[in-house]
Amino acid sequence: WDKALEKYEQILYIPMSSALSGAYSTARCLADEEEYKDKVFVVDAGSVSTPMHRLILDAIELINEGYSAKEILSIIEESREKMIIYIGLDTLENLKRGGRISGSSALIGNVLNIKPVMKFSTGLLDIHKKCRGISQCYQSRNF
């Protein structure tokens, strides 16, 4: 941050969701140090992929409009709460490996051809809906 602060007055750092990485916590601790007070602002993206990219594009637009990093932080945190990703999974294998479901649940789900729709919202990943077959997931657009 020291090199960036030689060129810029303020830094706005947007790491991926704190639920998925320790980058936010580390950056938050560093930003709280006296030398970075009111100079470095850290936003928990609460997501990854497209919603995180959208937050970054919004931040760039706000910078170009002349907003301060502190103002952008507030705006980004508010809009972050409205972003949701839905993902239809074709296999239960990764949920089993990640400990989200048991081996027996994965076995039964596979036998019944259950395909979960996952909801990723502000750092939380949950099973939103269960479908019978992947085509039902694709047809089910009213999440």
Each language-model region and where it sits:
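Mixed-charge interfacial surface used for oligomerization/domain docking
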Residues: 10, 19-41, 47-57, 61-143
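Glycine/small-residue-rich loop that forms an oxyanion/phosphate-binding "nest" at active or ligand-binding sites
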Residues: 13
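Glycine-rich phosphate-binding loop signature in dinucleotide/nucleotide-binding domains
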Residues: 4-10
